[in-house]
């Protein structure tokens, strides 16, 4: 359970942006970097599905997919000359205004532990 909780924490935008931001990168490169990092984290944690209920695993996968969609959506609203900092700001704005809440996902997973 610890690894899946860490995965969820690590893919929340307010967690991965400070960890990965290279302000001067073009936003397109940063977009790819973020998506690749999330996919690598997910692949590393694939075996965790053995320890979770089908519902908890599905919620985790959906959260990952929705975060990637959010990143792509934020990127489409960036002007061509935007930087990684611009994209990071847009991602956080989208995340704050969205229904995606990592804490809700964590509650579902933690409920299984108890």
Task: Pin down the residues of each PLM region.
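Conserved non-transmembrane functional hotspots
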Residues: 1-114
């Amino acid at each position: 359970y610890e690894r899946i909780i860490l995965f969820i924490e690590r893919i929340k935008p307010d967690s991965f942006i400070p960890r990965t931001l290279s302000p001067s990168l073009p936003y397109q490169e940063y977009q790819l970097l973020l998506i690749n990092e999330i996919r690598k984290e997910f692949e590393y944690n694939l075996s965790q599905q053995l320890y979770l209920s089908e519902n908890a695993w599905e919620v985790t996968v959906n959260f990952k997919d929705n975060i990637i969609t959010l990143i792509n959506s934020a990127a489409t609203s960036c002007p061509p000359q935007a930087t990684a900092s611009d994209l990071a700001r847009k991602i956080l704005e989208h995340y704050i205004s969205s229904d995606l809440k990592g804490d809700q996902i964590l509650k579902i997973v933690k409920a299984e532990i108890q």
